[in-house]
Amino acid sequence: MDKQSKIILISGPTASGKSNFAVKIAKKIEGEIINADSMQVYKKLKILTARPNKQEQKNIKHHLYGFVDLNEKFSTGQWLELTIKKIENIQKKKKIPILVGGTGLYFQSLINGLVKIPEIPLKFRNKVRLMSKKEGQKKFYKKLLKLDPKIKDKFDPNDTQRSIRAYEIKSYTNISMYDWLAKTKSEFNDSDFLKLHIDTKREKLVEKINLRTSSMLNNGAISEVKKFLKLKIKKDQSVNKVIGIAELTQYLNDEITLDEAEELISIKTRQYAKRQATWARTRMTSWIKVDPIKLDGYIKKLKKSSLKLDQLT
């Protein structure tokens, strides 16, 4: 693999302006963009997933957007395999790969490699989740420490999702999650990446989320959900997690008003952004925090030859 140039990674919460930032960088340094958002891989649902539109993709090559059938399951492992190939092809053309998205697990798999943990049955996982809910996070975390002492000080004790994952892995495989992680191997070195995280203040992000929700509803989201419902997608498909489907379905069934649907979509999006922020705070500590107000200034400092941002703070 040609590793003469760095690979740029751009993360940030939903509605933070990642896609636009990536396009501007790509124009400046002759880059091509690779999707790192688990919902934007699906066909259809362009509006609800906030997939870059034709104008945004104009003159800049975009990869791994809107190519997975809605009825297909698409794993992190599949994304990683395709992404590595895309990176290789882009670098062969002497261009810069720019990965942009909000799916932390995708970035983690690229940087650290993918953990080859055996698939844990859904019934078993649901049992652990129910236990977590009944116990409460504080009590559940203490129980996790007894089961797997190796996880102590490895992550925030208030991180519910990570606690659940650690518990189900240890209890099902009898091997600590961190022993599994130790077995992983990445195709890359950490020095191969320039990792940028758009660090948006919560008040500003809430404002942007509300504006984007309103824009989606005014630009075809309802029609998009009507078409989606006609496809009769299985309920266990990941695409059903796209924010807006459930809420607009309720509206179309006359269960709630459009204003109520809009508010619910905004609330759920804010909750998702909060989870993304927690991931970034606990698992992206080495990433460069980029002030969204100063994005254009950072782009001016970016040079293809060195791919370093000077005076970031």
From Swiss-Prot:
InterPro entries: Dimethylallyltransferase, IPT, P-loop_NTPase. Residues 37-40, 161-165 are annotated as: Interaction with substrate tRNA. Substrate binds at residues 14-19. SUPFAM superfamilies: P-loop containing nucleoside triphosphate hydrolases (SSF52540). Keywords: ATP-binding, Magnesium, Nucleotide-binding, Transferase, tRNA processing. Coiled coil: none annotated. It comes from the Bacteria. It is an enzyme of class 2 (transferase). It catalyses: adenosine(37) in tRNA + dimethylallyl diphosphate = N(6)-dimethylallyladenosine(37) in tRNA + diphosphate. Its EC number is 2.5.1.75. ATP binds at residues 12-19. One of its GO terms (biological process) is tRNA modification. Monomer. Belongs to the IPP transferase family. This is tRNA dimethylallyltransferase. It comes from Pelagibacter ubique (strain HTCC1062).
